[in-house]
Protein backbone atom coordinates (compact mmCIF):
# COMPACT_ATOMS: atom_id res chain seq x y z
CA UNK A 1 0.00 0.00 0.00
CA UNK A 2 1.34 3.40 -0.94
CA UNK A 3 1.64 6.16 1.69
CA UNK A 4 -0.86 8.24 -0.29
CA UNK A 5 -3.48 5.44 -0.28
CA UNK A 6 -2.90 4.78 3.41
CA UNK A 7 -3.52 8.45 4.14
CA UNK A 8 -6.81 8.41 2.19
CA UNK A 9 -8.06 5.36 4.12
CA UNK A 10 -7.11 6.97 7.44
CA UNK A 11 -9.05 10.20 6.80
CA UNK A 12 -12.57 8.90 7.64
CA UNK A 13 -11.24 7.13 10.74
CA UNK A 14 -9.65 10.33 11.99
CA UNK A 15 -12.81 12.28 11.23
CA UNK A 16 -14.84 9.94 13.51
CA UNK A 17 -12.33 10.02 16.38
CA UNK A 18 -13.53 11.79 19.54
CA UNK A 19 -11.96 15.22 19.75
CA UNK A 20 -11.86 15.23 23.53
CA UNK A 21 -9.02 12.71 23.59
CA UNK A 22 -7.02 14.88 21.21
CA UNK A 23 -7.65 17.97 23.32
CA UNK A 24 -6.09 16.22 26.30
CA UNK A 25 -2.81 15.57 24.47
CA UNK A 26 0.06 17.81 25.61
CA UNK A 27 1.24 20.63 23.36
CA UNK A 28 4.53 19.39 21.83
CA UNK A 29 5.88 22.95 21.85
CA UNK A 30 5.70 23.09 25.65
CA UNK A 31 6.82 19.53 26.40
CA UNK A 32 10.21 19.38 28.18
CA UNK A 33 12.91 18.06 25.87
CA UNK A 34 15.42 15.52 27.07
CA UNK A 35 19.04 16.63 26.96
CA UNK A 36 20.53 15.67 23.62
CA UNK A 37 23.22 13.02 23.78
CA UNK A 38 25.34 12.61 20.65
CA UNK A 39 27.32 9.39 20.38
CA UNK A 40 30.34 9.79 18.10
CA UNK A 41 32.91 7.26 16.90
CA UNK A 42 36.09 7.13 18.96
CA UNK A 43 38.92 9.25 17.58
CA UNK A 44 42.41 7.86 18.21
CA UNK A 45 45.50 10.01 17.74
CA UNK A 46 49.21 9.52 17.21
CA UNK A 47 52.17 11.50 15.87
CA UNK A 48 54.92 10.35 13.52
CA UNK A 49 58.55 11.08 14.38
CA UNK A 50 58.62 13.95 11.85
CA UNK A 51 55.83 15.81 13.65
CA UNK A 52 52.96 14.74 11.39
CA UNK A 53 49.84 14.53 13.57
CA UNK A 54 47.20 11.88 12.83
CA UNK A 55 43.56 11.44 13.90
CA UNK A 56 42.12 7.99 13.18
CA UNK A 57 38.70 6.33 13.28
CA UNK A 58 38.31 2.60 12.73
CA UNK A 59 35.31 1.96 10.45
CA UNK A 60 34.73 -1.46 8.90
CA UNK A 61 31.44 -0.70 7.11
CA UNK A 62 33.13 -0.68 3.69
CA UNK A 63 36.47 -2.03 2.39
CA UNK A 64 37.67 1.53 1.80
CA UNK A 65 39.97 4.17 3.24
CA UNK A 66 39.40 7.94 3.38
CA UNK A 67 42.11 10.47 4.20
CA UNK A 68 41.93 14.23 4.64
CA UNK A 69 45.08 16.30 5.08
CA UNK A 70 45.26 19.91 6.24
CA UNK A 71 48.14 22.38 6.25
CA UNK A 72 48.08 25.63 8.21
CA UNK A 73 48.74 27.79 5.15
CA UNK A 74 46.26 29.37 2.78
CA UNK A 75 45.59 32.55 0.86
CA UNK A 76 46.65 34.56 3.92
CA UNK A 77 50.19 33.44 3.05
CA UNK A 78 49.98 34.83 -0.50
CA UNK A 79 52.79 37.40 -0.92
CA UNK A 80 51.88 40.99 -1.70
CA UNK A 81 51.07 41.36 -5.39
CA UNK A 82 50.68 37.59 -5.87
CA UNK A 83 47.22 36.84 -4.55
CA UNK A 84 46.07 33.47 -5.86
CA UNK A 85 49.38 31.69 -5.20
CA UNK A 86 48.05 29.27 -2.56
CA UNK A 87 45.13 28.26 -4.76
CA UNK A 88 47.27 27.73 -7.86
CA UNK A 89 49.84 25.73 -5.88
CA UNK A 90 47.19 23.39 -4.46
CA UNK A 91 45.58 22.89 -7.87
CA UNK A 92 48.92 22.00 -9.46
CA UNK A 93 49.76 19.42 -6.79
CA UNK A 94 47.01 17.27 -8.28
CA UNK A 95 46.96 18.34 -11.92
CA UNK A 96 50.66 18.98 -12.48
CA UNK A 97 52.11 15.51 -12.03
CA UNK A 98 55.15 14.53 -9.96
CA UNK A 99 58.88 14.32 -10.52
CA UNK A 100 58.44 10.67 -11.53
CA UNK A 101 55.06 10.83 -13.30
CA UNK A 102 53.67 13.26 -15.85
CA UNK A 103 50.19 14.66 -15.27
CA UNK A 104 48.73 12.19 -17.79
CA UNK A 105 50.52 9.22 -16.23
CA UNK A 106 49.32 10.23 -12.78
CA UNK A 107 45.73 10.57 -14.02
CA UNK A 108 45.83 7.15 -15.71
CA UNK A 109 47.25 5.47 -12.62
CA UNK A 110 44.63 6.93 -10.28
CA UNK A 111 41.79 6.16 -12.70
CA UNK A 112 43.00 2.56 -12.96
CA UNK A 113 42.79 2.29 -9.18
CA UNK A 114 39.36 4.01 -9.04
CA UNK A 115 40.91 6.41 -6.53
CA UNK A 116 39.78 9.96 -5.87
CA UNK A 117 42.51 12.49 -5.00
CA UNK A 118 41.93 16.24 -4.70
CA UNK A 119 43.72 19.34 -3.41
CA UNK A 120 42.51 22.85 -2.61
CA UNK A 121 43.26 26.01 -0.64
CA UNK A 122 41.13 28.24 1.57
CA UNK A 123 41.76 31.42 3.53
CA UNK A 124 43.62 29.89 6.47
CA UNK A 125 44.57 26.46 5.19
CA UNK A 126 45.29 24.17 2.28
CA UNK A 127 44.36 20.53 2.11
CA UNK A 128 44.08 17.27 0.27
CA UNK A 129 41.58 14.42 0.10
CA UNK A 130 41.97 10.74 -0.77
CA UNK A 131 39.40 7.97 -1.13
CA UNK A 132 40.30 4.50 -2.34
CA UNK A 133 39.79 0.78 -1.79
CA UNK A 134 41.66 -0.65 1.19
CA UNK A 135 43.67 -3.01 -1.00
CA UNK A 136 45.02 -0.06 -3.00
CA UNK A 137 45.68 2.24 -0.04
CA UNK A 138 49.47 1.69 0.14
CA UNK A 139 49.90 2.60 -3.54
CA UNK A 140 47.43 5.51 -3.52
CA UNK A 141 48.83 7.09 -0.35
CA UNK A 142 52.30 6.65 -1.80
CA UNK A 143 51.19 8.67 -4.83
CA UNK A 144 49.57 11.27 -2.57
CA UNK A 145 52.83 11.66 -0.65
CA UNK A 146 54.71 11.92 -3.95
CA UNK A 147 52.48 14.79 -5.08
CA UNK A 148 53.26 16.66 -1.87
CA UNK A 149 56.97 15.94 -1.72
CA UNK A 150 57.95 16.03 -5.39
CA UNK A 151 55.47 18.15 -7.37
CA UNK A 152 56.40 18.63 -11.01
CA UNK A 153 55.11 22.17 -11.79
CA UNK A 154 55.74 21.63 -15.51
CA UNK A 155 55.59 24.84 -17.54
CA UNK A 156 52.71 23.67 -19.72
CA UNK A 157 50.60 22.73 -16.68
CA UNK A 158 51.43 25.98 -14.91
CA UNK A 159 50.34 27.90 -18.01
CA UNK A 160 47.13 25.84 -18.22
CA UNK A 161 46.18 26.45 -14.56
CA UNK A 162 47.06 30.14 -14.87
CA UNK A 163 44.80 30.51 -17.92
CA UNK A 164 42.08 28.55 -16.12
CA UNK A 165 42.35 30.92 -13.15
CA UNK A 166 42.28 34.00 -15.38
CA UNK A 167 39.23 32.62 -17.17
CA UNK A 168 37.49 32.13 -13.83
CA UNK A 169 38.24 35.73 -12.82
CA UNK A 170 36.87 36.96 -16.14
CA UNK A 171 33.68 34.93 -15.70
CA UNK A 172 33.24 36.46 -12.25
CA UNK A 173 32.87 39.87 -13.89
CA UNK A 174 29.61 38.60 -15.40
CA UNK A 175 28.29 37.50 -11.99
CA UNK A 176 27.08 40.58 -10.08
CA UNK A 177 26.94 38.79 -6.73
CA UNK A 178 30.61 37.77 -7.03
CA UNK A 179 31.65 41.28 -8.08
CA UNK A 180 29.80 42.80 -5.13
CA UNK A 181 31.19 40.28 -2.63
CA UNK A 182 34.71 41.02 -3.80
CA UNK A 183 34.08 44.75 -3.38
CA UNK A 184 32.58 44.31 0.09
CA UNK A 185 35.51 42.13 1.14
CA UNK A 186 37.85 45.00 0.33
CA UNK A 187 35.69 47.34 2.40
CA UNK A 188 35.62 45.03 5.44
CA UNK A 189 39.23 43.78 5.46
CA UNK A 190 42.54 45.48 4.80
CA UNK A 191 44.57 44.49 1.74
CA UNK A 192 47.16 42.62 3.83
CA UNK A 193 44.67 40.03 5.05
CA UNK A 194 41.37 38.71 3.78
CA UNK A 195 40.97 41.74 1.54
CA UNK A 196 44.00 40.60 -0.50
CA UNK A 197 42.07 39.05 -3.40
CA UNK A 198 43.30 37.58 -6.67
CA UNK A 199 43.30 39.80 -9.75
CA UNK A 200 44.47 39.17 -13.33
CA UNK A 201 47.61 41.15 -12.53
CA UNK A 202 48.45 39.14 -9.40
CA UNK A 203 47.85 35.80 -11.14
CA UNK A 204 50.04 36.78 -14.10
CA UNK A 205 52.83 37.74 -11.67
CA UNK A 206 53.03 34.23 -10.14
CA UNK A 207 56.08 32.28 -11.35
CA UNK A 208 57.07 28.63 -11.27
CA UNK A 209 59.60 29.55 -8.58
CA UNK A 210 56.81 31.08 -6.46
CA UNK A 211 54.82 27.85 -6.70
CA UNK A 212 57.78 25.68 -5.72
CA UNK A 213 58.69 27.98 -2.84
CA UNK A 214 55.14 27.98 -1.44
CA UNK A 215 54.94 24.18 -1.56
CA UNK A 216 58.41 23.69 -0.08
CA UNK A 217 57.78 26.18 2.72
CA UNK A 218 54.31 25.18 3.88
CA UNK A 219 53.61 21.62 2.70
CA UNK A 220 55.82 19.90 5.25
CA UNK A 221 54.96 17.15 7.76
CA UNK A 222 55.25 19.26 10.91
CA UNK A 223 52.70 21.71 9.46
CA UNK A 224 50.29 18.92 8.57
CA UNK A 225 47.39 17.10 10.23
CA UNK A 226 45.94 13.93 8.72
CA UNK A 227 42.49 12.52 9.36
CA UNK A 228 42.18 8.84 8.44
CA UNK A 229 39.11 6.63 8.60
CA UNK A 230 38.26 3.28 7.11
CA UNK A 231 38.63 -0.47 7.16
CA UNK A 232 41.83 -0.48 9.18
CA UNK A 233 43.01 -1.33 12.67
CA UNK A 234 45.10 1.20 14.57
CA UNK A 235 48.27 -0.81 13.93
CA UNK A 236 47.46 -1.00 10.20
CA UNK A 237 46.84 2.76 10.10
CA UNK A 238 50.18 3.49 11.76
CA UNK A 239 52.06 1.18 9.39
CA UNK A 240 50.31 2.62 6.33
CA UNK A 241 51.09 6.24 7.19
CA UNK A 242 54.61 5.51 8.36
CA UNK A 243 55.34 3.87 5.02
CA UNK A 244 53.89 6.81 3.04
CA UNK A 245 55.16 9.72 5.14
CA UNK A 246 57.59 8.43 7.77
CA UNK A 247 60.84 9.33 5.97
CA UNK A 248 59.65 12.84 5.04
CA UNK A 249 61.92 15.18 7.04
CA UNK A 250 60.44 17.99 9.09
CA UNK A 251 61.32 21.58 8.18
CA UNK A 252 61.65 24.95 9.84
CA UNK A 253 58.44 26.95 9.58
CA UNK A 254 58.50 30.74 9.17
CA UNK A 255 56.30 32.91 11.35
CA UNK A 256 52.86 33.54 9.88
CA UNK A 257 52.24 37.29 9.75
CA UNK A 258 48.45 37.11 9.67
CA UNK A 259 46.58 40.37 9.91
CA UNK A 260 43.24 41.30 11.47
CA UNK A 261 43.88 45.03 11.25
CA UNK A 262 40.71 47.03 10.60
CA UNK A 263 40.06 48.24 7.11
CA UNK A 264 40.61 51.88 6.21
CA UNK A 265 37.07 52.03 4.83
CA UNK A 266 34.76 53.73 7.32
CA UNK A 267 31.34 52.26 8.14
CA UNK A 268 28.74 53.68 5.79
CA UNK A 269 27.25 53.26 2.35
CA UNK A 270 29.27 52.43 -0.77
CA UNK A 271 27.97 52.37 -4.34
CA UNK A 272 29.54 50.56 -7.27
CA UNK A 273 27.61 51.89 -10.24
CA UNK A 274 27.18 49.61 -13.23
CA UNK A 275 25.16 51.00 -16.12
CA UNK A 276 22.53 48.73 -17.64
CA UNK A 277 22.22 46.42 -14.63
CA UNK A 278 18.52 45.72 -14.11
CA UNK A 279 19.00 44.08 -10.72
CA UNK A 280 20.93 45.29 -7.70
CA UNK A 281 23.06 43.41 -5.21
CA UNK A 282 22.67 44.87 -1.72
CA UNK A 283 25.18 43.76 0.92
CA UNK A 284 26.11 44.67 4.46
CA UNK A 285 29.33 43.50 6.08
CA UNK A 286 31.58 43.82 9.10
CA UNK A 287 34.43 41.96 10.75
CA UNK A 288 33.22 39.11 12.90
CA UNK A 289 34.74 36.76 15.43
CA UNK A 290 36.98 33.77 15.77
CA UNK A 291 35.86 30.19 16.21
CA UNK A 292 37.12 30.16 19.81
CA UNK A 293 35.24 33.30 20.85
CA UNK A 294 33.24 32.76 24.09
CA UNK A 295 30.17 34.36 22.45
CA UNK A 296 30.31 32.20 19.32
CA UNK A 297 27.40 29.93 20.28
CA UNK A 298 25.11 32.73 21.47
CA UNK A 299 25.72 34.99 18.48
CA UNK A 300 25.50 32.01 16.12
CA UNK A 301 21.94 31.46 17.37
CA UNK A 302 21.03 35.13 16.98
CA UNK A 303 22.43 35.33 13.46
CA UNK A 304 20.48 32.19 12.56
CA UNK A 305 17.31 34.08 13.47
CA UNK A 306 18.38 37.20 11.60
CA UNK A 307 19.26 35.66 8.27
CA UNK A 308 20.63 32.13 8.25
CA UNK A 309 17.65 30.02 9.29
CA UNK A 310 16.26 29.10 5.87
CA UNK A 311 12.93 30.58 4.80
CA UNK A 312 11.97 31.52 8.36
CA UNK A 313 14.65 34.12 9.04
CA UNK A 314 13.83 37.79 9.62
CA UNK A 315 15.59 39.24 6.59
CA UNK A 316 13.86 36.79 4.25
CA UNK A 317 10.45 37.29 5.86
CA UNK A 318 10.68 41.07 5.86
CA UNK A 319 12.35 41.83 2.54
CA UNK A 320 11.00 39.00 0.40
CA UNK A 321 7.83 37.58 1.99
CA UNK A 322 6.22 40.72 3.45
CA UNK A 323 7.39 43.31 0.92
CA UNK A 324 8.16 41.18 -2.15
CA UNK A 325 11.33 43.14 -2.86
CA UNK A 326 14.00 40.48 -3.30
CA UNK A 327 14.67 37.22 -5.07
CA UNK A 328 16.86 36.20 -2.15
CA UNK A 329 17.63 37.72 1.24
CA UNK A 330 19.48 36.61 4.34
CA UNK A 331 22.84 36.70 6.08
CA UNK A 332 25.91 34.55 6.62
CA UNK A 333 28.64 34.27 9.22
CA UNK A 334 32.21 33.03 8.80
CA UNK A 335 34.07 32.06 11.97
CA UNK A 336 37.84 32.02 11.44
CA UNK A 337 40.56 30.43 13.55
CA UNK A 338 43.62 32.70 13.36
CA UNK A 339 42.05 35.97 12.16
CA UNK A 340 38.72 37.68 12.73
CA UNK A 341 35.82 36.23 10.77
CA UNK A 342 33.03 38.09 9.02
CA UNK A 343 29.30 38.78 9.13
CA UNK A 344 27.39 39.87 6.06
CA UNK A 345 23.78 40.33 4.99
CA UNK A 346 22.46 40.26 1.45
CA UNK A 347 19.48 40.95 -0.79
CA UNK A 348 19.18 40.47 -4.55
CA UNK A 349 16.52 42.87 -5.79
CA UNK A 350 15.25 44.70 -8.85
CA UNK A 351 16.67 48.16 -9.46
CA UNK A 352 13.67 50.20 -8.35
CA UNK A 353 13.54 48.30 -5.01
CA UNK A 354 17.20 48.91 -4.13
CA UNK A 355 16.77 51.76 -1.66
CA UNK A 356 13.81 50.23 0.17
CA UNK A 357 15.47 46.80 0.40
CA UNK A 358 18.61 48.37 1.86
CA UNK A 359 16.56 50.36 4.35
CA UNK A 360 14.73 47.25 5.54
CA UNK A 361 18.00 45.34 5.84
CA UNK A 362 19.45 48.06 8.03
CA UNK A 363 16.28 48.23 10.15
CA UNK A 364 16.33 44.48 10.83
CA UNK A 365 19.96 44.62 11.91
CA UNK A 366 19.20 47.55 14.22
CA UNK A 367 16.14 45.77 15.62
CA UNK A 368 18.20 42.69 16.47
CA UNK A 369 20.81 44.79 18.26
CA UNK A 370 18.18 46.73 20.24
CA UNK A 371 15.68 44.00 21.15
CA UNK A 372 17.39 40.66 20.58
CA UNK A 373 15.35 37.60 19.66
CA UNK A 374 12.03 36.30 21.02
CA UNK A 375 11.46 33.14 23.10
CA UNK A 376 9.88 31.37 20.13
CA UNK A 377 12.76 32.33 17.84
CA UNK A 378 15.25 31.10 20.44
CA UNK A 379 13.57 27.71 20.75
CA UNK A 380 13.48 27.28 16.96
CA UNK A 381 17.10 28.36 16.59
CA UNK A 382 18.22 26.07 19.39
CA UNK A 383 16.40 23.12 17.83
CA UNK A 384 17.96 23.85 14.43
CA UNK A 385 21.47 24.11 15.85
CA UNK A 386 21.07 20.88 17.83
CA UNK A 387 19.90 19.07 14.69
CA UNK A 388 22.89 20.44 12.82
CA UNK A 389 25.19 19.02 15.49
CA UNK A 390 23.59 15.59 15.14
CA UNK A 391 23.95 15.46 11.36
CA UNK A 392 27.45 17.00 11.43
CA UNK A 393 28.65 13.71 12.92
CA UNK A 394 26.75 11.43 10.58
CA UNK A 395 29.84 9.64 9.23
CA UNK A 396 33.32 8.75 10.42
CA UNK A 397 34.67 11.08 7.74
CA UNK A 398 32.69 13.99 9.23
CA UNK A 399 33.90 13.29 12.75
CA UNK A 400 37.56 12.86 11.85
CA UNK A 401 37.38 15.95 9.60
CA UNK A 402 36.19 18.04 12.55
CA UNK A 403 38.99 16.59 14.69
CA UNK A 404 41.53 17.59 12.03
CA UNK A 405 40.32 21.19 12.11
CA UNK A 406 40.46 21.40 15.89
CA UNK A 407 43.96 19.91 15.97
CA UNK A 408 45.31 22.09 13.15
CA UNK A 409 44.31 25.25 14.99
CA UNK A 410 45.21 24.15 18.50
CA UNK A 411 41.75 23.41 19.89
CA UNK A 412 40.97 20.40 22.13
CA UNK A 413 39.37 17.35 20.52
CA UNK A 414 36.30 17.77 22.74
CA UNK A 415 35.63 21.30 21.43
CA UNK A 416 32.52 20.20 19.57
CA UNK A 417 31.12 18.35 22.59
CA UNK A 418 31.78 21.38 24.81
CA UNK A 419 30.06 23.64 22.28
CA UNK A 420 27.02 21.35 22.24
CA UNK A 421 26.95 21.37 26.04
CA UNK A 422 27.12 25.16 26.07
CA UNK A 423 24.28 25.44 23.55
CA UNK A 424 22.01 23.25 25.65
CA UNK A 425 22.75 25.31 28.76
CA UNK A 426 22.24 28.74 27.18
CA UNK A 427 19.28 30.89 28.13
CA UNK A 428 17.46 33.46 26.02
CA UNK A 429 18.72 36.18 28.34
CA UNK A 430 22.33 35.12 27.76
CA UNK A 431 21.84 35.15 23.99
CA UNK A 432 20.32 38.62 23.98
CA UNK A 433 22.94 39.97 26.38
CA UNK A 434 25.66 38.78 23.98
CA UNK A 435 23.84 40.42 21.06
CA UNK A 436 23.60 43.77 22.87
CA UNK A 437 27.25 43.62 23.85
CA UNK A 438 28.79 42.38 20.59
CA UNK A 439 26.57 43.21 17.59
CA UNK A 440 26.93 46.84 16.48
CA UNK A 441 25.09 47.59 13.20
CA UNK A 442 26.60 51.08 13.13
CA UNK A 443 29.87 49.37 12.15
CA UNK A 444 28.39 47.82 9.00
CA UNK A 445 29.67 48.72 5.56
CA UNK A 446 26.73 48.60 3.15
CA UNK A 447 27.70 47.89 -0.44
CA UNK A 448 25.39 48.31 -3.42
CA UNK A 449 26.13 47.14 -6.95
CA UNK A 450 23.58 48.48 -9.40
CA UNK A 451 22.55 51.14 -11.89
CA UNK A 452 21.49 54.34 -10.07
CA UNK A 453 19.43 55.34 -13.10
CA UNK A 454 17.16 52.37 -12.37
CA UNK A 455 16.61 53.11 -8.68
CA UNK A 456 13.48 55.13 -9.42
CA UNK A 457 12.36 58.11 -7.37
CA UNK A 458 13.95 56.87 -4.14
CA UNK A 459 17.46 58.18 -3.69
CA UNK A 460 20.24 56.18 -2.07
CA UNK A 461 21.39 59.41 -0.41
CA UNK A 462 18.20 59.36 1.69
CA UNK A 463 19.87 56.62 3.75
CA UNK A 464 23.07 58.57 4.36
CA UNK A 465 26.28 59.68 2.70
CA UNK A 466 27.10 57.59 -0.39
CA UNK A 467 30.72 56.90 -1.32
CA UNK A 468 31.27 55.82 -4.95
CA UNK A 469 33.76 52.97 -5.51
CA UNK A 470 35.11 51.21 -8.58
CA UNK A 471 35.00 47.70 -7.12
List where the protein language model places each region:
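An aromatic/glycine/proline-enriched structural segment found at the starts
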Residues: 19-24, 29-31, 225-290, 393, ...
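M16/MPP (pitrilysin/insulinase) zinc-metallopeptidase core fold and M16-derived inactive scaffolds
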Residues: 66-131, 174, 193-197, 310-325, ...
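M16/insulysin-pitrilysin zinc metalloprotease superfamily fold
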Residues: 95-101, 131-162, 309-310, 334-392, ...
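Short acidic/His-enriched helical or mixed secondary-structure segments at domain edges of catalytic enzymes
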Residues: 164-183, 260-279, 317-326, 371-426, ...
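Non-catalytic, conformational "gating/processing" segments within enzyme and secreted inhibitor domains
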Residues: 182, 208-244, 442-445
Amino acid sequence: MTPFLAALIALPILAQAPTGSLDRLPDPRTMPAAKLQVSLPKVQSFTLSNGLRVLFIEDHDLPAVTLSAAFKAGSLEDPSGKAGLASMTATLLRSGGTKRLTASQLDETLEGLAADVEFGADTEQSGGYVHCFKKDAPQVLGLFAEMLREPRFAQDRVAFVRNQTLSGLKQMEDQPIQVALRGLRRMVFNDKGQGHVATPESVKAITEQDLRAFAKTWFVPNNMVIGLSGDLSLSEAKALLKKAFGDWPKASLPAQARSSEPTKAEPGLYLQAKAGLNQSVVLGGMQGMRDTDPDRVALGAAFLVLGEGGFGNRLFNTIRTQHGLAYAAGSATAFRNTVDGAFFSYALTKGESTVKALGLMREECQKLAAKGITPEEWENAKRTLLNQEVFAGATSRDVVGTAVQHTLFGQPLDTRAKRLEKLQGLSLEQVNEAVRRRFHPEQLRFYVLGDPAGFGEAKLESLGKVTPVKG
